[in-house]
Amino acid sequence: MYVFKALAGIVLALVATLAHAERIRDLTSVQGVRENSLIGYGLVVGLDGTGDQTTQTPFTTQTLNNMLSQLGITVPTGTNMQLKNVAAVMVTASYPPFARQGQTIDVVVSSMGNAKSLRGGTLLMTPLKGVDSQVYALAQGNILVGGAGASAGGSSVQVNQLNGGRITNGAIIERELPSQFGAGNTINLQLNDEDFTMAQQITDAINRARGYGSATALDARTVQVRVPSGNSSQVRFLADIQNMEVNVTPQDAKVVINSRTGSVVMNREVTLDSCAVAQGNLSVTVNRQLNVNQPNTPFGGGQTVVTPQTQIDLRQSGGSLQSVRSSANLNSVVRALNALGATPMDLMSILQSMQSAGCLRAKLEII
């Protein structure tokens, strides 16, 4: 009996060390409480000769003519305006939940023509619309561009992107979105990651604190919570629930590979079994040259002959089997993979092969 209790205590201690507590607010979000996208089309002025080439971007000239006509300025028909300080841009923003009229939000400005840079430009008043084509905000202000560049004599140097920028607090909300918060007696909590175990643990924690039947797990991502009626009562109720702590069990072992950049990211649950890996690097170099043969006598009537000469060089390095030891923690996994001496691009193929062979104990996700 004492031996059984001692073993049970050891098991509980091991589970406690593997799990850690996190707040429900860090694991879930409230369904319906989300951002909405806004978009608009406008003009940026004040550029130092780095704007659109209006002959190649007729929409810039058309937009400028429409704006001037609204300001009472008429441009004679057929006028060919060669402007270099104006650029047509797209403006995007995120409408935050529960935003009120008069609140300011950040906007992102991106060139849609052939402007060289938006640095130093000013965005003119641009209406921002939602998917329902209603105007919800107005954007205007000076653009902050994070990049820098210079060009002279056919040479140019550029750091970061010059055709996009940001305006902090650059848009003012003019229309409020209708909200259904507080209208019903239930609220759905959506888990950030689908997990049946986590959904049930959140349900049990809420039921222990608020009484049985207060929460129900609908699926691996949704927990439905019964709340009192009224906005203020629901705000207080959610504030208490979101600050509850839940023991988080270890996550699924996962390796994420970015096929475009070659980056490989893995969590600490990834483990390796013993295996042998051989990876050969094959490189092919093709060099083509043109040999010109001319006659020795300029007036002898001979012809110049051009003969191509192609040289192909094929090299293969590596290829020997490398032993990979069984690894039980992330540091050991990293050391074992680094011992292969493979580049990130090679590592992508190696990890796929190791998973197929059953040596990689993790889910492999390629983005």
Curated annotation (Swiss-Prot):
Principal location listed in the UniProt entry: periplasm
Signal peptide range: 1-21
Subcellular location(s) per record: Periplasm; Bacterial flagellum basal body
Keyword annotations from UniProtKB, A to Z: Bacterial flagellum, Periplasm, Signal
GO molecular-function term, one example from the UniProt record: structural molecule activity
Listed GO biological process terms: bacterial-type flagellum-dependent cell motility
Pfam family, one: FlgI
Any one of the GO CC terms: outer membrane-bounded periplasmic space
Quaternary structure and partners: The basal body constitutes a major portion of the flagellar organelle and consists of four rings (L,P,S, and M) mounted on a central rod.
Function in brief: Assembles around the rod to form the L-ring and probably protects the motor/basal body from shearing forces during rotation.
PANTHER family assigned: FLAGELLAR P-RING PERIPLASMIC PROTEIN FLGI, FLAGELLAR P-RING PROTEIN
Database matches in NCBIfam families: PRK05303.1 (NF003676)
Family from the record: Belongs to the FlgI family.
Protein's UniProt name: Flagellar P-ring protein
Organism per entry: Salmonella arizonae (strain ATCC BAA-731 / CDC346-86 / RSK2980)
Gene from which the chain derives: flgI
